[in-house]
């Protein structure tokens, strides 16, 4: 499964449902990251966001989401997904947290800018599911 434009074609207004606060928070993080990462990495991140949203809709990712993408220039994202740029391995691991972090550009801060959005607890009847998908390109 390679993240291509065809595989993750957007339908305006339907990708992130308004009734899901977790998906809304995820959309915020994705758009924020896309303002920093462009080109291939930006496309991959957007694809990962769509996968995460689908898992939320299916009830697989239960109460919260985590985004994590490593990049040489930024230590940005973790979306409960880690993308290794050298081996081009896509790992998808459901987590129950939503966390987004970007390094501060202000050296006086001496820390990192961290943003997190809480999600409501979902039904306790949903099974605790954790999936991991590993795909290698080429």
Curated annotation (Swiss-Prot):
Membrane topology: Multi-pass membrane protein
Primary localization: membrane
The keyword Transferase appears for this protein: no
Alphabetic keyword roster: Membrane, Transmembrane, Transmembrane helix
TM region positions: 32-52, 65-85
A GO CC term attached to the entry: membrane
Keyword hit for Membrane: yes
Superkingdom of the organism of origin: Eukaryota
UniProt region (Disordered), positions on chain: 109-138
Protein name (Swiss-Prot/TrEMBL): Putative protein encoded by LINC02912
Record gene name: LINC02912
Subcellular location: Membrane
């Amino acid at each position: 499964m390679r993240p291509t434009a065809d595989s993750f074609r957007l339908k305006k207004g339907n990708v992130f449902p308004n009734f899901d606060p977790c998906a809304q928070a995820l959309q915020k993080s994705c758009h924020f990251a896309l303002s920093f990462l462009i080109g291939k990495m930006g496309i991959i991140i957007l694809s990962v966001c769509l996968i995460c949203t689908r898992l939320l809709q299916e009830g697989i990712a239960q109460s919260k989401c985590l985004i994590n993408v490593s990049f040489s220039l930024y230590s940005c994202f973790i979306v409960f997904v880690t993308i290794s740029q050298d081996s081009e391995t896509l790992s998808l691991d459901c987590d129950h947290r939503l966390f987004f972090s970007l390094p501060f550009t202000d050296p006086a801060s001496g820390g990192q800018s961290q943003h997190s959005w809480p999600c409501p607890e979902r039904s306790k009847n949903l099974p605790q599911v954790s999936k991991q998908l590993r795909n290698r390109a080429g």
